[in-house]
């Protein structure tokens, strides 16, 4: 066991995690040069297109070190984006150490900090690596000082490498062996294996990635899942090199996969412990903290007959994405669908895109809302994640909105823009620290504002240099109201939103104007109104299309024309009473894009 090293790679977006992992695989001969593709571990098409890592992936490599021994390296490539931080904490639970990769040109960013603190809290050894030293703008000494100053770990003798050109990658491997401790565990103890990740394979059933903490899991043995108490047979065990490679057993300290033909989707939940069916361990391993969804949105299939396949797709996806939450929902405008809870807007986009791609569904999403805490007049507390579930205002004592603590790292010259943006988003500043050229500011902001478009606006006001990391801290009382859209006096439930009272005029007008552009003209007038309770705050009308009924009168008496016009008027009146307005799908999407 002293020749095993388990580590993960953590870094901010675009600091070169995936490229560095490619190099490590190449140096250790995990794949032949012919099989090497850029970003080997980003296996989803979506990951490659966007250039981001979404799912953590694991690889086991053999490394012949300079001290003459052969070491077994298990490493896990992790996502860098704030929405996927739970993936990072899951990966770190399986490791003894982490490589903190920092771009020698960009320096420390907020996400680097957040992931690094997660690693330090889990008592992992953090090894700093300065990447991209081949760039002309690289300043390794300044960045090393910055790491010491902001993160507080010793970085003066940090390894300097360039994952792109391959310079210094062997030094990184030597550093891993020197600085990261071997795993502790007892091979003779009862089996305890932590499930780090699972996914569903159409042929094999559920495939689980496990880290063996104690004991040995042999091929063909019976094991049980501790949370459900179900027993299964380990049909295949093995490691990823990144290709699947079957083995006869997985020993304590190793990371590998188990395939046992589990067909029910939640048979082996992530964070669970496996043990032997007979003479197993008594206690499960401490799992991960369940992440609570921060943002909810209704998602509906465009054609109602896709509902069943939509449900199956969500079940399969939630196995692979442990943070997804969903429950059935119906809407008078959109039919049957699900209310889905996400970790953030990027997560929401990715989930929708994965559903559309991997399961061939056509979906429509309503405007996202955060969870509000509502105190009723009778003293009970309810949590509302859907605008249509908000009780009438006269029954409510107060509404409390979720507040996040946002840590923003920004170069000095853009500080003014960032502060202006935070004030506009109803934020209050709690802290500001200067680190050389960077400033770390801490703001308390309403989550609803952060969720909408804060990240994009932050990037554009700072030319992409500011970086953001946030977490939920508390609920605060706020003057929130529900804005309804009425079309010819009928509320459209899918367009309702909960917003702050200071924004209603501006938001209501913008929405009404947008709807006016998108709803096609009918044979009768359509009134579009924005209302809060019974008070109408904005209105716009779509004029009726009309046929020129007097065209066939040549000259003649005016009373003849009047008669025809009046007859038309009567018809329009009747039509308006019975006619209903189809709201096109673009209109629902427009609500999401209102701020663009």
UniProtKB/Swiss-Prot annotation:
Pfam families: EFG_C, GTP_EFTU, GTP_EFTU_D2, LepA_C. GTP binds at residues 14-19, 131-134. It catalyses: GTP + H2O = GDP + phosphate + H(+). Coiled coil: none annotated. Its main location: membrane. SUPFAM superfamilies: EF-G C-terminal domain-like, P-loop containing nucleoside triphosphate hydrolases. It comes from the Bacteria. It is found in: Cell inner membrane. Keywords: Cell inner membrane, Cell membrane, GTP-binding, Hydrolase, Membrane, Nucleotide-binding, Protein biosynthesis. GO terms for biological process: positive regulation of translation. Gene3D superfamilies: 3.30.70.240, Elongation factor 4, C-terminal domain, Elongation Factor G (Translational Gtpase), domain 3, P-loop containing nucleotide triphosphate hydrolases, Translation factors. The keyword NAD does not apply. GO terms for cellular component: plasma membrane. Its EC number is 3.6.5.n1. Belongs to the TRAFAC class translation factor GTPase superfamily. Classic translation factor GTPase family. LepA subfamily. Required for accurate and efficient protein synthesis under certain stress conditions. May act as a fidelity factor of the translation reaction, by catalyzing a one-codon backward translocation of tRNAs on improperly translocated ribosomes. Back-translocation proceeds from a post-translocation (POST) complex to a pre-translocation (PRE) complex, thus giving elongation factor G a second chance to translocate the tRNAs correctly. Binds to ribosomes in a GTP-dependent manner. PANTHER family: TRANSLATION FACTOR GUF1 HOMOLOG, CHLOROPLASTIC, TRANSLATION FACTOR GUF1-RELATED. This is Elongation factor 4. It comes from Shewanella frigidimarina (strain NCIMB 400).
